[in-house]
A protein has these predicted regions:
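N-terminal secretory signal peptides that target proteins for export/translocation
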Residues: 1-20
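Bacterial N-terminal signal peptides
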Residues: 21-35
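Extracellular/luminal low-complexity Ser/Thr/Pro-rich, glycosylation-prone repeat/linker regions
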Residues: 40-47, 103, 139-184, 234-239, ...
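Surface-exposed, proline-enriched loop/turn segments that connect beta strands in immunoglobulin-like
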Residues: 48-52, 97, 114-115, 179-184
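Hydrophobic beta-strand positions in extracellular immunoglobulin-like domains
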Residues: 50, 67, 131, 144-146, ...
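Short beta-strand elements of extracellular/lumenal beta-sandwich folds
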Residues: 57-76, 190-209
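A surface/secretory-pathway sequence property marking extracellular, secreted
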Residues: 76-113, 117, 210-212, 216-259, ...
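Low-complexity, intrinsically disordered segments enriched in Ser/Thr together with acidic residues
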Residues: 115-138, 146, 255-288
Length: 317
């Protein structure tokens, strides 16, 4: 039997038998029960990271939602609800979990649900979310629910992040990260392979955390792989498979734990200030020369004063 349940039953019987005999014992039991209740932690915890502000709009914002099982048992049937609120038509473009699936986004869509299955004790799931800012403030709100080992419902959240157009709130981190795009080759014959390259550099000495790089890529490019190079071996870096974005595009999310700063990386080695992100693809066969576009959009847990977005163009013959 669960120790908390056993204690609860014992305390109830203790109170019933001893209430009339010794009020001091009753008070002690109540204090113990309250202390046990206070020490309990919710089996699910959540956090959210993303941009606090964009200098210019419209802009694509990338968020990362993390759900963690803080209990000692497997949690099952975990689902997430993600809702975007604004007053000007901002919408959710796409969402991608590190396990499981999410609904498709698109223009006019402001809620996306994700089903992520089970979560082992101590394990976490990350969900990358791309939202289109139109002109004003938008707020992403996420909550999670599931079942514990006894099939009792558990929940967490909501957690929220508001992103404003203009100056961020005082005290929030602000960093200028340079971003450039360099597809190779820039001209190629239809049916041939090419590579999309982006370079991220943070030379400010201020560390940027929880970076989300969302690449909006013409869906006629058949993506075969994507990767981040230049990070420390122990750093948390991952890129997901392409997911549908706005019509005619796919989105590839890459999540990067940090970039730049004055301290070492999570592995204790030298600080990484520059990263390269590459996407390998095969071009479509076309009847006339066509220009294909791929735009990389960078967000992190703070504000980028340079609004980093870089577009690569490829001419296919």
């Amino acid at each position: 039997m669960n120790p908390r349940t056993l204690f609860s039953r014992f305390a109830s019987r203790f109170l019933y038998l001893g209430a009339a005999r010794n009020p001091i014992l009753v008070a002690a039991a109540v204090i113990c029960a309250a202390a046990l209740s206070f020490a309990q932690t919710a089996p699910l915890s959540m956090s959210i990271s993303g941009p606090y502000a964009f200098k210019d709009a419209p802009a694509l914002a990338g968020y990362q939602v993390t759900v963690t099982n803080t209990s000692q048992a497997i949690l099952s049937n975990i689902s997430l609800s993600n809702a975007l609120s604004s007053g000007d038509g901002a919408y959710l473009i796409a969402a991608q979990p590190s396990q499981g699936t999410c609904d498709l986004g698109g223009q006019g869509i402001t809620t996306l649900s994700c089903s992520v299955g089970s979560l082992d004790p101590g394990a976490s799931i990350n969900i990358s979310i791309a939202a289109q800012m139109v002109s004003g403030t938008m707020t992403l709100s996420s909550s999670a629910s599931g079942l514990d080992a006894n099939s009792a419902p558990v929940s967490a959240g909501p957690v929220q992040r508001a992103t404003v157009h203009g100056n961020p709130l005082a005290g929030t981190p602000s960093v200028s990260i340079s971003l450039s795009a360099n597809p190779t080759p820039k001209d190629l014959v239809g049916g041939r392979t090419g590579t999309l390259n982006w370079t991220l550099q943070n030379s400010t000495g201020v560390r940027a955390n929880k970076l989300v790089f969302a690449m909006v890529i013409d869906s006629r490019m058949s993506i075969s792989s994507s990767a981040v190079t230049g990070s420390n071996a122990g750093d948390s870096v991952s890129c997901g498979a392409p997911v549908p974005g706005v019509p005619g595009t796919n989105i590839v999310f890459c999540n990067i734990d940090y970039l730049g700063g004055t301290s070492g990386g999570s592995g204790g080695s030298a600080t990484v200030t520059q990263l390269q992100i590459t996407v390998n693809y095969r071009s479509p066969v076309v009847s006339s020369q066509t220009t294909l576009l791929a735009t990389g959009n960078l967000s992190f847990d703070g504000t980028d004063s340079s609004n980093p977005a870089a577009t690569g163009q490829v001419r296919v013959k």
